[in-house]
């Protein structure tokens, strides 16, 4: 099955890497697989690639970890 993943800009990917290294909290908005939009302050933990798709691993304010597909992120700014 072909993925509908659309790679993000390398510069933006680098910004996520820097945020992970600096343990910077981010205010992130994204849509999930059911098209629900989420807005949350998160701490980025890691970047992962799986089956040609890239994900940001984050911890929410409640400590729960999740993976967010990079092309589903709508907006990101420092918290």
Predicted feature locations:
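Short glycine-rich, low-complexity segments
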Residues: 1-33
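Short beta-strand-centered aromatic/proline hotspots
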Residues: 38-48
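Short aromatic-glycine-enriched beta-strand elements
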Residues: 52-57
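Structured surface patches comprising rigid loops and adjacent beta-strands/short helices at the edges
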Residues: 68-79
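Short acidic/polar mixed-charge low-complexity motifs
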Residues: 34-38, 62-64
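Residue-level recognition of well-ordered beta-strand positions that form the cores
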Residues: 29-31, 43, 59
């Amino acid at each position: 099955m072909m993925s509908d993943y659309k790679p993000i800009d390398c510069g933006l990917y680098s910004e996520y890497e820097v945020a992970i290294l600096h343990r910077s909290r981010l205010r992130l908005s994204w849509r999930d697989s059911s098209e629900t939009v989420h807005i949350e302050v998160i701490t980025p933990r890691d970047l992962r690639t799986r089956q040609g798709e890239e994900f940001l691993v984050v911890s929410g304010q409640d400590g729960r970890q999740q993976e967010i597909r990079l092309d589903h992120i709508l907006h990101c700014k420092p918290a």
